[in-house]
Amino acid sequence: SKCFSPGTFCGIKPGLCCSVRCFSLFCISFE
């Protein structure tokens, strides 16, 4: 399954961000 890159909208499926977290509906990096 594909995962989302930083900056990708994740409001619908917040658990699919690649090595990033969902914040304010967008994937962001931990750095």
Curated annotation (Swiss-Prot):
Coiled coil: none annotated. GO terms for molecular function: sodium channel inhibitor activity; toxin activity. GO terms for cellular component: extracellular region. The modification 4-hydroxyproline is found at P6, P14. Keywords: Disulfide bond, Hydroxylation, Ion channel impairing toxin, Knottin, Neurotoxin, Secreted, Toxin, Voltage-gated sodium channel impairing toxin. Expressed by the venom duct. Disulfide bonds join C3-C18, C10-C22, C17-C27. It is found in: Secreted. The presence of a 'disulfide through disulfide knot' structurally defines this protein as a knottin. The cysteine framework is VI/VII (C-C-CC-C-C). Delta-conotoxins bind to site 6 of voltage-gated sodium channels (Nav) and inhibit the inactivation process. Potent paralytic toxin in vertebrate and invertebrate systems. Its binding appears to be voltage-dependent. Belongs to the conotoxin O1 superfamily. This is Delta-conotoxin NgVIA. It comes from Conus nigropunctatus (Black-spot cone).
